Amino acid sequence: MAKGSWFFIILFIISMLENMINSLELDRHSFPDDFIFGTAASAFQYEGATSEGGKSPTIWDHFSLTYPERTKMHNADVAIDFYHRYKDDIKLMKELNMDAFRFSISWSRLIPSGKLKDGVNKEGVQFYKDLIDELLANDIQPSMTLYHWDHPQSLEDEYGGFLSPKIVEDFRDFARICFEEFGDKVKMWTTINEPYIMTVAGYDQGNKAAGRCSKWVNEKCQAGDSSTEPYIVSHHTLLAHAAAVEEFRKCEKTSHDGQIGIVLSPRWFEPYHSDSTDDKEAAERALAFEIGWHLDPVIHGDYPEIVKKYAGNKLPSFTVEQSKMLQNSSDFVGINYYTARFAAHLPHIDPEKPRFKTDHHVEWKLTNHSGHIIGPGEERGFLFSHPEGLRKVLNYIKERYNNMPVYIKENGINDNDDGTKPREEIVKDTFRIEYHKTHFEELHKAIVEDGCDVRGYYAWSLMDNFEWEHGYTARFGLYYVDFVNGLKRYPKDSVKWFKRFLKKSVVGESNKEEVEEMSRAEGNKTFKGFEESAGFFASFMAMNQSRRDEENNRCSFDFPHTHFGVLQGIENPSSFY
């Protein structure tokens, strides 16, 4: 055979090898060895047992029971009954090969009155100790959130909850008890979950507890001021965070090897018109309010200048002492990333209808000026997949906050269930598999190509659960929960995918490394001869046969075009996502 023929054959083999190596899907071994993979939950959405074990009502108990029409006529009295079933659910986490479980502590279960002077509920303490021990016994690390929107209703009745500065010292006491009781076994802590969502949805839009807003914004709101209350609540939330961190760093059980941070919920924003300076600046303002409003204070001790400019005198200020307490009060930042929007400059707002949502002169849109949608969505109306936004958010934090450590504390997508879909259809969640797959790809790029210091990823959520104002109609779980027939758990197809992705001993992984080493030894550009090249190719094929067989058995992905029906008509969904 002529030399030229050998040359083209070798080039063909090299091309085949390169394509095959590049086509190998990511799995847990694609990430750093100490990278944490987990799943997440919250007390109110999971536990149930609202009147058991000494627990008092929370603001969400009050909200869902007093205004049932605002939560799809659903409540979380039982939720998914995690309070009684946690041992079985932890077994499912272990089967999924999860490293960690993020959950929140119910303030009302630990200190029913909300005030330490009235005593600590020993039964509540024991429940969380038992939960922690069960996790550790299954080699799952607990990650505890102090506050996931469910403070005792008694504090709301007494002084308005987070509308009052009194909440700060009560939260400090609650946090201190948590550190003293659980700090010897829990090393990962977060203070406040999604302060942006809590304040905006609860006090500007009024569609989440405490359900306050201006009457013209939402006629269901009984009281509130959408113009001022979000800033007040957010301010007290930040001070409560700082107080908790101060206690954390004084506590002997947590001060040496524990870490603590705040959890934010940023969307990514692209300019509505890519050539418009106004829209580019609008996107920057949107990010400043979504991220900087809460991250700047816990890093630098003060609000961003752009937030001060647009919020004006409605934005409270920190004292010198408060600023000092806030500065560097987050060892890491937790990010709950779900979706993205286009941002358009809003030149005029109605002075007769002031509210937080319009203060920064930004209008959120699902489509840009040419009609291009931000990403595939479904008939849920509030989540549209935009995985590249995750990478951009991580780089935004890297560039503006000195590449501080990041944990993805929530990421997931829901399936809308109006009661007409059979279980057999819902468990075929190929769209969820593709959602996680594409977000892992962008996360991997952020870490490997961009150098972002991301240290963990928690999927939302293990189980379908009570999804706030959506009740049980928005299913985020990897496991289907039958809310009609005894809360039985059924694995969705995404469970099978996650088991493969998180497998701790993957057949063929070492072979991949061996192939890469062989390629380097051969120069990967030229081979000594066709015989060696062909032998190498045959070796590669043999070593990866098991992986190819497994790939052939994977679910086919019909996302995004066939499984998602885009909801074109909703530009500003009321939901927090």
UniProtKB/Swiss-Prot annotation:
InterPro entries xrefs: Glyco_hydro_1, Glyco_hydro_1_N_CS, Glycoside_hydrolase_SF
Write down the chemical reaction(s) this protein catalyses: Hydrolysis of terminal, non-reducing beta-D-glucosyl residues with release of beta-D-glucose
The induction text for this entry reads:
By sucrose starvation, dark and senescence.
Q: What are the UniProt keywords, alphabetically?
A: Disulfide bond, Glycoprotein, Glycosidase, Hydrolase, Signal
Q: Does the keyword Isomerase apply?
A: no
Tell whether Disulfide bond is among the UniProt keywords.
yes
**SUPFAM superfamilies recorded for this chain?**
(Trans)glycosidases
Q: Where does a beta-D-glucoside bind?
A: 45, 148, 193-194, 338, 410, 460, 467-468, 476
Q: According to the lineage, what is the superkingdom?
A: Eukaryota
EC numbers, comma separated: 3.2.1.21
Protein name, per record: Beta-glucosidase 30
Question: What organism does this protein naturally occur in?
Answer: Arabidopsis thaliana
